[in-house]
Amino acid sequence: MFQSKDLNVYFICGTQDIPEGRTIQEVLKEALEGGITLYQFREKGNGAKTGQDKVALAKELQALCKSYNVPFIVNDDVALAEEIDADGIHVGQDDEAVDDFNNRFEGKIIGLSIGNLEELNASDLTYVDYIGVGPIFATPSKDDASEPVGPKMIETLRKEVGDLPIVAIGGISLDNVQEVAKTSADGVSVISAIARSPHVTETVHKFLQYFK
């Protein structure tokens, strides 16, 4: 059963985010040991795996998450999420509409990216379990990221969505997480600050301290 606290420290990662000399399996295991509360498999960009290689990797990482009782979410790829029976799916504004697949994801976690009021007003949140708001800060992890909206956008959208869980995303690091923790966000989505940390487990511990 999905709860807002599952968003506390939400790790998003694919092979494209892993520094040289490391593997995604190593990094994810260390992040799980550190206490991440949710993991999203986002395999896209230069050098990302495709086809059966992507499926095989997803299954391997899914099993790792299961051993730590951490939900495994697939970014964007509805077919993959169905094929491996993932715990949920996260889609953006330009991806497949939630209305098109929600009936195939009953009992699963559905997340939607929302960057501003216009996107919120254009979105049907009937079947959405949480929204990802951002980019809060400038982000190096997404080539297609739009302009940063700042922590204030969380409060702007909170007034509109009530108790719907909100996770902040985009450029979040240990240097700026305190600004997000002061808002009504239920947690933070983090890519590079965890994936590229020389001390992954310790970094996750530090993020968790802001969302107890």
Swiss-Prot record:
Its cofactor is Mg(2+). GO terms for biological process: thiamine biosynthetic process; thiamine diphosphate biosynthetic process. Mg(2+) binds at D76, D95. Binds 1 Mg(2+) ion per subunit. The keyword Transferase applies. The keyword Repeat does not apply. Pfam families: TMP-TENI. Keywords: Magnesium, Metal-binding, Thiamine biosynthesis, Transferase. One of its GO terms (molecular function) is thiamine-phosphate diphosphorylase activity. It comes from the Bacteria. 4-amino-2-methyl-5-(diphosphooxymethyl)pyrimidine binds at Q40, F41, R42, E43, K44, N75, S113, K142. InterPro entries: Aldolase_TIM (IPR013785), ThiamineP_synth_sf (IPR036206), ThiamineP_synth_TenI (IPR022998), TMP_synthase (IPR034291). 2-[(2R,5Z)-2-carboxy-4-methylthiazol-5(2H)-ylidene]ethyl phosphate binds at T139, P140, S141, G171, I191, S192. One of its GO terms (cellular component) is cytoplasm. Its EC number is 2.5.1.3. It catalyses: 2-[(2R,5Z)-2-carboxy-4-methylthiazol-5(2H)-ylidene]ethyl phosphate + 4-amino-2-methyl-5-(diphosphooxymethyl)pyrimidine + 2 H(+) = thiamine phosphate + CO2 + diphosphate; 2-(2-carboxy-4-methylthiazol-5-yl)ethyl phosphate + 4-amino-2-methyl-5-(diphosphooxymethyl)pyrimidine + 2 H(+) = thiamine phosphate + CO2 + diphosphate; 4-methyl-5-(2-phosphooxyethyl)-thiazole + 4-amino-2-methyl-5-(diphosphooxymethyl)pyrimidine + H(+) = thiamine phosphate + diphosphate. Pathway: Cofactor biosynthesis; thiamine diphosphate biosynthesis; thiamine phosphate from 4-amino-2-methyl-5-diphosphomethylpyrimidine and 4-methyl-5-(2-phosphoethyl)-thiazole: step 1/1. Condenses 4-methyl-5-(beta-hydroxyethyl)thiazole monophosphate (THZ-P) and 2-methyl-4-amino-5-hydroxymethyl pyrimidine pyrophosphate (HMP-PP) to form thiamine monophosphate (TMP). Belongs to the thiamine-phosphate synthase family. This is Thiamine-phosphate synthase. It comes from Staphylococcus carnosus (strain TM300).
